[in-house]
Amino acid sequence: MLVTRVAQRLSSTAVFEAMIRPTPALAASLLLGCALAATAADLTPGATATTPLTLDYLGALDRAQQQSPKLAAARAAADGRALQAEALRGLGGPSVSVGAAVARYRLGTSIDPGALLPSSSGLLGNSPLAAGLASAASRLPSFEVEQSGTRSGASVSAVWPLYTGGAIQGAQGLAAARRQEAEADWLAAGDDLDALLTERYFSAQLAAIAAGLRAQAARTAGEHDHAAARMLQEGVIAPVDRLQASTALRDAQRQASAAQSDAELAAVALARTVGAGQPVRPSTPLFVLTQPVEPLAHFFDLAMAHHPGLAKVAAKRTQAEQLHAAQQGLRGPQVLALASSQLRDRPNWAAGVAVSWTLWSSIDRDQLSRATLKDIEQADLTDAQARSDIQLLVERQWRAVDNARRQFMAFDAHLAEGDELLRLRRAGLREGTSTALALIDAETRQAQRRTERAQIAYQYTQALAGLLHASGQPRDITRYLARPDAVFIKPTDAPAP
């Protein structure tokens, strides 16, 4: 987008072929004046803001990975799910617990001796002893008995599930599948961050190129203005032509300032992505491979094997399968081994086996089973759609890469023609057969071609990054940067004098 704006601005700079061609002597003086003006422009000190941080592409990737809160949050979620799955690994083993109790008590009762007579009279019958006991008991008073104290006890108990019908294995599998889903989300977050970094990194590079070309166009317009002023003094052009040159210079300066502002904004956006406290200057240039990338089938295979979206869908299906297995397990008998022992000098203990089987429940378990089967079906259909969408995205990006490569290669002929025209214009100006304004026109058009070429290189880089992102291998772009057929477009590139 930035280069498109610059290209439009470049094309708006008028070049005036109708001006009168100067004599050879005047042409030489004009060339000297242009050189002095260009030198003065180059030596003019500019405002020095915060010193930018220079980062290559790999360094920017590493910083972005370290500084991204979103990626850190995804990693924390994945770690949490992993800890949950690890915690459930021992599910189904024995559980042992210890219990203890301390109690303070107070007991009180009233005893009536006369109440004991009926039980003893039955044994003695009508003997004189029985009559004597009855007479004695009637004279005894009742009395109160009270007792208080503290008692304590401890016990140890154990429970061991012997058979759960697969419910425990289903719970463990569900936790493992949730961990896989969280890992897929983390990988997807990392891939998205890599794609964002790639877009902002090379956007900043493109903006720097555009700013350089726009600044060069402003210097060319300055030469134009200086030449027009000299020609007006010599009386070879009209005042209106001089006014047009001044207007073109002001327009070029304004456009150069806007392009520089765009470049600074792109550098700030890149700095935010990598977590830097100052603007970032990218050092890895835009590039285009002169040879085609691997065949389309190669990227299809990579996407099917490594795309995190497919890994997440697979984890969702596994979750549905494990939930279905757990529900089915709960429909069968549950067998537990139990044991308990009192911890005393002469402990009491008990051990046994408990069996539980729910024959009827208020919950319709058949409907729940069908629901989990529908979840599995949904995951299968989602996987099929995701594979189709990913293949379409891969093919679209692969074709975009190849189209950008072809356009870039075709531009070499245009640049060669422009360079040849510049050579002829310079030679004509030295020999007095051409005008300085014709040379400026050729330089302006060549700068526009270089801008368009840089824009195509940016489109190629972004298409390649999109292809690798769709294939689940976003960091492989560094491998393509190292290929021997890579052609680099740097901000310092300028037309040959």
PLM regions and their residue ranges:
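Sec/SRP-type N-terminal targeting helices
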Residues: 72-76, 89-90, 145-151, 162-190, ...
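A short glycine-centered flexible hinge/capping loop motif at secondary-structure junctions
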Residues: 232-236, 429-433, 470
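Acidic, low-complexity, intrinsically disordered peripheral segments
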Residues: 40-44, 49, 104-106, 110, ...
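A small-residue-enriched
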Residues: 62-163, 272, 276, 300-367, ...
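Regulatory alphaC helix of protein kinase catalytic domains
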Residues: 46-60
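Periplasmic alpha-helical coiled-coil/stalk elements that build and connect Gram-negative outer-membrane
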Residues: 55, 85, 184, 188-302, ...
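Bacterial N-terminal signal peptides that target proteins for export
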Residues: 5-27
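Bacterial N-terminal signal peptides
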Residues: 27-35
